[in-house]
Amino acid sequence: MKVDLLTAATILVLSAALIPFATNAPAARTAAASESGTPLGPVDTYFVTQTSLGTPFQVDAGRVALAKGTTQAIRSYADLMVSSHITVNDALLAVLKNKAPVPPPTLLKASYATTVSSLQHESGSTLDADYVRGQVNYQKANAALYEYEIANGTDPDLKTFAQETLPKIQDHLARALKLQAAEK
């Protein structure tokens, strides 16, 4: 069975939908404290965890597509994903600099690693199609995650970060949709 970005993105969206009910989940119980002593709520903690998890995944998947993509458009998009996610991660780290650490993510690591491994073993138009389809699904799920943080997060710094970053995610989605349309 082939695990792809669609599977990972679906898990991300479904997990986000369950946040309000996850009061016994480790991430919900483990509230990180902000600099002011106000604890990060479960939504903020989940947001940080998922955003932190997405960065290495996007960088790794992007590097595979950058090296093996068959068109300049795919390679350019992959290069954008690598550089953009490194920049976004640096911005998130700056926001979190004076906050207590958030527990490391565990749920999706294996799924993301499997997806990157699948891409590494693909080539040609199959790799291009799977990478682009996965990007469309990932960017939709990522936009939903950021919108959820903006609407429901309690940490003002994280909400501002999400508000400033969401337009970039929407741009990434628009570019991925354009690549997908070009394949048809």
Predicted regions and their residues:
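His/Met- and acidic-residue-enriched segments that coordinate or traffic transition-metal cofactors
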Residues: 3-7, 19-184
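Hydrophobic helical h-region of N-terminal Sec-dependent signal peptides
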Residues: 10-14
